[in-house]
């Protein structure tokens, strides 16, 4: 289970650092989702991200302190040159579309293809339909997104950065899944350590993806008021 950490970095010892990337078209609310998670803030005057920025937040998962390093980039084509550096080292990804703009959902397969071309094959991915507070403007049926997520093996949630609906759940779902995968690797390594097959796993762990076990089946979650 994950428990909320401070908005800002705590002074506690960090056990893991997980890099998670936000991707999707411009103006779907990626930066707003990040601001809500990292600082519990929302601004109607938020400007489009130029280039790349990242923020951090610490959480406790299974009594371990995890620093989430969340990267946000512009969705515009002219900034696509940052691709390789942006995805390098990422162990989680959030594919974001706007439920009121069908085009942003229709572009998700392209973003997913780019992600899979540049990131580790075992990266944990969640599909996010943002702005679910705008019920009367919905242009993407929840079932369409659920079906796509199931077909591609992704987690799925609808969120509202404005109302803080499911934002925390989206991040903790990804981070907890990453932690579970890493923890299984650590246990396997500990078992082989007696045979001299593994280096010590003590101390801070900066998690970089590599060959790993298969990621378990994903869950689908829809927008619900907390």
Swiss-Prot record:
GO terms for molecular function: GTP binding; GTPase activity. The keyword GTP-binding applies. A motif (Effector region) lies at residues 46-54. CDD domains: Rab11_like (cd01868). GO terms for cellular component: plasma membrane. A lipid is attached at residues 222-223 (S-geranylgeranyl cysteine). It is found in: Cell membrane. Keywords: Cell membrane, GTP-binding, Lipoprotein, Membrane, Methylation, Nucleotide-binding, Prenylation. It comes from the Eukaryota. Its main location: membrane. Residues 224-226 form a propeptide. The modification Cysteine methyl ester is found at residue 223. GTP binds at residues 24-32, 43-49, 72-76, 130-133, 160-162. InterPro entries: P-loop_NTPase, Rab_GTPases_membrane_traffic, Small_GTP-bd, Small_GTPase. PANTHER family: DRAB11-RELATED. Belongs to the small GTPase superfamily. Rab family. This is Ras-related protein Rab11A. The lineage of its organism: Eukaryota, Viridiplantae, Streptophyta, Embryophyta, Tracheophyta.
């Amino acid at each position: 289970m994950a428990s909320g950490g401070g908005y800002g970095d705590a002074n506690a010892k960090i056990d893991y650092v997980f890099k998670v990337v936000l991707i999707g078209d411009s103006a779907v609310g990626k930066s707003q989702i990040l601001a809500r998670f990292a600082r519990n803030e929302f601004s109607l005057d938020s400007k489009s991200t130029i280039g790349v920025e990242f923020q951090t937040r610490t959480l406790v998962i299974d009594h371990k302190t995890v620093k989430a390093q969340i990267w946000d980039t512009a969705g515009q084509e002219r900034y696509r040159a940052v691709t390789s550096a942006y995805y390098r080292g990422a162990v989680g990804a959030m594919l974001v579309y706007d439920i009121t703009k069908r085009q942003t959902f229709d572009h998700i397969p392209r973003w997913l293809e780019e992600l899979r071309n540049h990131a580790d094959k075992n990266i944990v991915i969640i599909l996010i339909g943002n702005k679910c507070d705008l019920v009367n403007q919905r242009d993407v049926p929840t079932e369409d997104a659920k079906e796509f997520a199931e077909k591609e093996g992704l987690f799925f949630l609808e969120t509202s950065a404005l109302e803080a609906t499911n934002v925390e759940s989206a991040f903790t779902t990804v981070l907890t899944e990453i932690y579970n995968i890493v923890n299984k690797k650590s246990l396997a390594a500990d078992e082989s350590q007696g045979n001299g097959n593994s280096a010590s796993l003590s101390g801070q762990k900066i998690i970089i993806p590599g060959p790993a076990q298969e990621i378990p089946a994903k869950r689908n979650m829809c927008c619900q008021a907390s």
